[in-house]
């Protein structure tokens, strides 16, 4: 069984507000947030940059592999069974912005948000981009596979073989989400 350890998201919080800025007029004046939770209990979130802003969702993945062989029946009428189970789950860990009084985002360049949640239950959300604003959905994958091989023997002579494979793949996408009391 192989499992990748979970990585914790960066967390920024402020009771009366959170402000992040990159105001200088040069090409490196960008803001990049990846798998980050930013919250303000009683205030606003303000993010400003002269250049581009990127809100990336990291893909966390869980993979398991199990192989099991066993025998059933009496010595003269044996059934040998081999099962291989495989499971893969990949889901995005997004940027979450949550402020009770509102969210203000301004960029002189582009804003690219991958599966980002903008949440301002008692306020408004203002997003301004100088060039372009793009909200992306990020793919989520759930994959299960069962491979089963059965052999039957009677007095040591093989007389039946069966091989079954069952595969289930479910792909969904986590979109960017904007929730506010007023827009």
Question: Language-model segments: what does each one mean?
Answer:
Residues 1-183:
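Binding/recognition "hotspot" determinant
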């Amino acid at each position: 069984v192989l499992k990748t350890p979970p990585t914790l998201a960066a967390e920024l919080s402020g009771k009366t507000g959170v402000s992040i800025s990159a105001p200088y007029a040069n090409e490196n004046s960008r803001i990049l947030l990846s798998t980050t939770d930013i919250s303000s209990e009683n205030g606003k979130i303000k993010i400003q940059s002269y250049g581009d802003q990127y809100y990336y969702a990291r893909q966390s993945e869980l993979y398991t592999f199990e192989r099991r062989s066993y025998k059933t029946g009496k010595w003269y009428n044996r059934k040998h069974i081999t099962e291989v189970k495989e499971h893969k789950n990949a889901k995005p860990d997004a940027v979450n912005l949550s402020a009770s009084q509102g969210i203000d985002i301004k960029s002189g360049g582009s804003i690219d948000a991958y599966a980002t949640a903008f949440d301002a239950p008692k306020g408004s959300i203002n997003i301004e981009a100088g060039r372009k604003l793009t909200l992306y959905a990020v793919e989520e994958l759930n994959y299960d596979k069962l491979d089963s091989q059965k052999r039957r023997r009677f007095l040591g002579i093989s007389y039946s073989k069966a091989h079954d494979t069952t595969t289930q793949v479910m792909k969904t996408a986590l979109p960017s989400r904007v929730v506010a009391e007023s827009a």
